[in-house]
UniProtKB/Swiss-Prot annotation:
Cofactor note: Binds 1 zinc ion.
Main location: cytoplasm
Family: Belongs to the endoribonuclease YbeY family.
GO BP term, pick one: rRNA processing
Annotated EC: 3.1.-.-
Protein name in UniProt: Endoribonuclease YbeY
Family matches, as InterPro entries: MetalPrtase_cat_dom_sf_prd, YbeY, YbeY_CS
One Pfam family in the UniProt entry: YbeY
Function: Single strand-specific metallo-endoribonuclease involved in late-stage 70S ribosome quality control and in maturation of the 3' terminus of the 16S rRNA.
Gene expressing this chain: ybeY
SUPFAM superfamilies tied to this protein: Metalloproteases ('zincins'), catalytic domain (SSF55486)
Amino acid sequence: MSVEVTNETAWQIDGKIFSDLGVWVMSQMRVSTQSDLTIMFVDPDPIAQLHMRWMNLEGPTDVMSFPMDELRPGDGGTEMEGVLGDIVLCPWVAAQQALAAGHSTMEEMMLLTIHGILHLLGYDHVTPEQERQMFGLQRQLLLTFFALRQGAGARATLPAGTPDALAEWDREHAAGGKTAK
């Protein structure tokens, strides 16, 4: 399994943790060891552009998934092989959501990584039943990953004095009455 992590933000993020998480989740979902995944951290403007282009929705969002080979979870004896796809996350939006949820930005980004992988595997949350199944699975995966790592907590931080890119995005786009979602 190959997981490439790219950080195009000012956030200081330990890519190895996200690589380990991606490999672990793919193995739990019975994705082939020959499969590839890319996780990219971006600022509000790039994810807002992707959000508009692919979802026709304005403003930055937390995570977007771009499947490649449309792999699905393997059954008990079969592993799927191919390129799983790309996940794009915005730490700025994740930090805002983490604050509202009462946990760390790192925990939120790890949850969003799992959420993105599940989307790549065909999970969705359009109906209440789909939401219950997907959100339950992502929570179970995250808690199990935390338990296996025995609480080894890493942090996502910003260098002192880094401007708030999400607030800047909101200010730049406020003239049109649009703010981050």
